[in-house]
Amino acid sequence: MSSTPGSSLSADFSEREQQIFHRTRLLVGDQVLHRIGDLRVILFGVGGVGSWCAESLVRSGVRRLTLVDSDRVSITNVNRQMPATVPTVGRVKVEVVRERLLAINPDAEIRAVQDIYCAENAESFALDTYDVIIDAIDSLAEKAHLILRATQTSALFVSSMGAALKMDPTRVQIAEFWKVGGCPLARALRNKFKRAKTRPKRK
């Protein structure tokens, strides 16, 4: 693998992208970078968790990303959300995030959908067409519905639980849903599934 920033990676990557991801390429190699670049990713929620997730994805080489969120930027978002600054207050979050991501990689395909995921419109998102589904929704009913649907697909599925009012980042862990502890949101979701006598498919 060449260490020259402009050396050919693939016809799929623009010359600019080859320069942007040069250091990532040195770290993970051509094959992994191609896999990352080919992923079709959909992210639900671009608030305090999802907005930073979106930026990390694009900086890591994800080039096809759909953003879904119905909210507009509020002044109270400024302390913790990537799209929130005083000048962006009142603007549609997914549009602000899209602009930010295209400033990072102008050649990326970033789709912004100003909508809320819910049972009534769930079918419109065609989850089976994505390789990765990320849940950063903070409303219980919509989150539960997305978990049930996403776990029925072949996609890699990641769901963010709750970290509100928590101060120790060293205690954040990645765990199987039924094993998550110390999280009121995860507990509420498990109780909701038990009451409904349904369970997400294990991934």
Region locations from a protein language model:
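Alpha-helix C-terminal capping/helix-to-coil transition sites in glycosyltransferase folds
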Residues: D38, L127-T129
